[in-house]
Amino acid sequence: MEISFRQTSLKDAERELFFLQSLESENINGFQMKIPKNMKEFEKLLNKFIKDSENPDSGRVPQKVYWVEINEKIIGIVKIREILNENLKKIGGNIGYLVGKDYRNKGYGKKILKDALALFRNHKYIIITCNESNIPSQKVIKDNGGKLIETNNGHCVYKINL
């Protein structure tokens, strides 16, 4: 199962928007993102992703957004935050990931998180969270070495030692 991460850029906006709009009718279960309705809204979101990767607004931390692909087909999204503020220590963590509905329950979530962890080779550990109701995500996190350290207002907070 060969996946690749491609950082956000404006060049593949049409494919990326199509993927996000395929998620609109479902609960994206804690992956905090408003689904754009059209290309104008999406370009605004992409520009925010690009800005947030280098120069986030006050109170926010740098965050890189990657599209997860297999053979140039988007199957998910990963958000990477190398540093955390107090809020992200409770909800969000260092890594956020989303697997498209057609690719769930096939091992992609586990592989996506494993590959995302490799981006943190200079860290001793990462924090990752998910909704208490998201049992599949809890399994993915545990399968990648996650240890539950607390629950907080419906969110599970895990630590993964690297």
Language model features by range: what are they?
Residues 96-99, 105-119, 138-143:
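Conserved acetyl-CoA-binding loop-helix of GNAT-fold acetyltransferases
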Residues 133-150:
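Conserved active-site alpha-helix within GNAT-family acetyltransferase domains
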Residues 99, 130, 160-162:
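Hydrophobic residues in beta-strands and at strand termini
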Residues 4, 96, 127-129:
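Short aromatic/hydrophobic contact patches that present stacked aromatics
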Residues 120-131:
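Conserved GNAT acetyl-CoA-binding A-motif
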Residues 1-94, 153-162:
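GNAT-family acyltransferases
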Residues 83-85, 102, 133:
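Short coil/turn motifs at secondary-structure junctions
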